[in-house]
A protein has these predicted regions:
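N-terminal charge/polar-biased segments
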Residues: 112-150
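A C-terminal functional module that forms or caps the active site or interfaces directly
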Residues: 56-103
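Buried hydrophobic positions in well-ordered alpha/beta secondary-structure cores of metabolic enzymes
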Residues: 8-9, 74, 122
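Short, solvent-exposed amphipathic alpha-helical segments in soluble enzyme
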Residues: 22-29, 88-93, 123-128
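Short, flexible loop segments at boundaries between secondary-structure elements
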Residues: 45-47, 100-115
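Active-site rim loops that border cofactor/substrate pockets in soluble metabolic enzymes
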Residues: 11-17, 21-71
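Internal alpha/beta core interface subdomains
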Residues: 1-12, 26, 106
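Flexible, glycine/charged-enriched surface loops at secondary-structure junctions
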Residues: 1-6, 35-45, 132-145
């Protein structure tokens, strides 16, 4: 896929301050709109149903290049990602390859119950992920966290 369609998932498809993942998705979409994130078409927040079903998106009135045709699903956190991966594997027969993004380097992540194919495929897949690039103003760069000391 030359330009993958990325669905930034949340429980709902509208931005609300009460659900952090909707704010995160909106911020990522804004960054993509400004050219700070390139190489993909991002949209979100999207609920799972309208990320994978054009009919669900149509019923909910969502018009998007991504809805119903997502190539990549980005889950809001590790817990929901783990649950989604296991649901897809056990109920839909999906093959898995575990990679955690967001750290300084990609992390290969396998389950104790994973078969040999997943265990063999995950490390090279993690190694193939390019390092993160974020074109931000100097004032917006991430600084190392310091511990709070009372």
């Amino acid at each position: 896929v030359a330009l993958p369609k990325v669905a930034l998932l949340s429980a709902v498809e509208t931005v609300t301050a009460r659900i952090t993942s909707t704010l995160d998705a909106a911020a990522l979409c804004k960054m993509a709109q400004r050219g700070q994130i390139t190489g993909a078409i991002l949209d979100g927040p999207l609920a799972f149903d309208n990320a994978i079903s054009a009919e669900a998106a149509r019923i909910k009135g969502i018009t998007s290049e991504v809805s119903g045709d997502a190539d990549i699903l980005v889950l809001p956190d590790l817990e929901s990602g783990n649950v989604a991966a296991k649901l897809l594997e056990y109920l839909a027969g999906a093959a898995s390859c575990g990679v955690v993004l967001g750290a300084r380097v990609p992390i290969a992540l396998t389950s104790r119950a994973d078969g040999a194919a997943s265990r063999v495929a995950s490390p090279p897949r993690a190694a193939a992920v390019p390092p993160p690039t974020l074109e931000a103003a100097p004032s917006a760069q991430v600084r190392p966290r310091t511990r709070f000391r009372p």
